[in-house]
């Protein structure tokens, strides 16, 4: 049976240096990192956030835009990013499908789990867009939900750091990397892995969460294909020494 993974990228990772828009070089880099996975037989699902375009929380903080409307705007932003990512993957000769939780048939397919799984079985990449289709849920939760639905072996949160730390390593030089932790430990307030809903969903379904640095070339291949887990953090139901 082929290994099936769900990889979550933040929208900010796609942004230009000013934090906005879509950086074509980053798109190209991500696609170049995904291609070896597909070529080796890994079935790949992707979720990308929309923070480089708009965040629902930020859009609604002045009180003019309702939070629910802000979240829908954020969902539309993820569709924009998903289509951009689809183009980059196809540039590398890969076959990719965008499935949206909100129907927009002229742009992408609606999310249908059986169709998504069939695409994966045929070696196509599926990019899941528009979150869960509901406001008040993050793209981390959407990614975890899709990972569970498609029967992924793991969910990988590809970030700008090489794992989970006890505090922000960009602010605190003495931050300690946590190589292995349980779901309950990941739910602690000072440990930022994903939001609580996403972690609880992963826990209920025994879905391993892997946090790694997306900007280290070959890292995804090393983790997924070579099973090299030294350069990441893993969240599971128990620690390695238990």
UniProtKB/Swiss-Prot annotation:
Its activity is regulated as follows: Inhibited by UTP.
Q: Where does UMP bind?
A: 50, 71, 132-139
Keyword list (alphabetical) reads: ATP-binding, Cytoplasm, Kinase, Nucleotide-binding, Pyrimidine biosynthesis, Transferase
Q: What is its main location?
A: cytoplasm
Question: Which cellular compartments is it found in?
Answer: Cytoplasm
List ligand-binding residues for ATP. Answer: 8-11, 51, 55, 159, 165, 168
Query: Which InterPro entries does its entry note?
Result: AceGlu_kinase-like_sf, Asp/Glu/Uridylate_kinase, Uridylate_kinase, Uridylate_kinase_bac
Designated name of the protein: Uridylate kinase
Family per record: Belongs to the UMP kinase family.
Keyword Nucleus in annotation: no
* An example Gene Ontology molecular-function term: UMP kinase activity
Listed NCBIfam families? pyrH_bact (TIGR02075)
Annotated Pfam families: AA_kinase
Annotated pathway = Pyrimidine metabolism; CTP biosynthesis via de novo pathway; UDP from UMP (UMPK route): step 1/1
An annotated GO cellular component of this protein is: cytosol
User: Which reaction equations make up its catalytic activity?
Assistant: UMP + ATP = UDP + ADP
This molecule's function is given as: Catalyzes the reversible phosphorylation of UMP to UDP.
Organism ancestry? Bacteria, Pseudomonadati, Campylobacterota, Epsilonproteobacteria, Nautiliales
């Amino acid at each position: 049976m082929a290994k099936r993974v769900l990889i979550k990228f933040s929208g900010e990772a796609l942004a230009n240096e000013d934090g906005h828009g879509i950086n074509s070089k980053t798109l190209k880099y991500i696609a170049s990192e995904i291609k070896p996975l597909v070529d080796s037989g890994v079935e790949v699902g992707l979720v990308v956030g929309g923070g480089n375009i708009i965040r629902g929380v930020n859009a609604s903080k002045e009180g003019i835009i309702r939070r629910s409307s802000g979240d829908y705007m954020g969902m539309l932003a993820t569709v924009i990013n998903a289509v951009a990512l689809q183009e980059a993957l196809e540039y590398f000769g890969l076959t990719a499908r965008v499935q949206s939780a909100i129907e927009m048939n002229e742009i992408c397919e609606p999310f249908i789990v059986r169709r998504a799984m069939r695409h994966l079985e045929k070696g196509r990449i599926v990019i899941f867009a528009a979150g869960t289709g509901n406001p008040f849920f993050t793209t981390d939760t959407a990614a975890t939900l899709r990972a569970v639905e498609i029967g992924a072996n793991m969910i990988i949160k590809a970030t700008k750091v090489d794992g989970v730390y006890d505090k922000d390593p960009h602010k605190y030089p003495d931050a300690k990397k946590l190589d292995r932790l349980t779901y309950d430990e990941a739910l602690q307030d000072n440990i930022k892995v994903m939001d609580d809903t996403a972690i609880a969903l992963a826990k209920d379904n025994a879905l391993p969460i892997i946090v790694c640095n997306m900007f280290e070339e070959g890292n995804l291949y090393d983790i997924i294909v070579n099973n090299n887990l030294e350069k990441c953090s893993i969240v599971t139901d128990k620690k390695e020494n238990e």
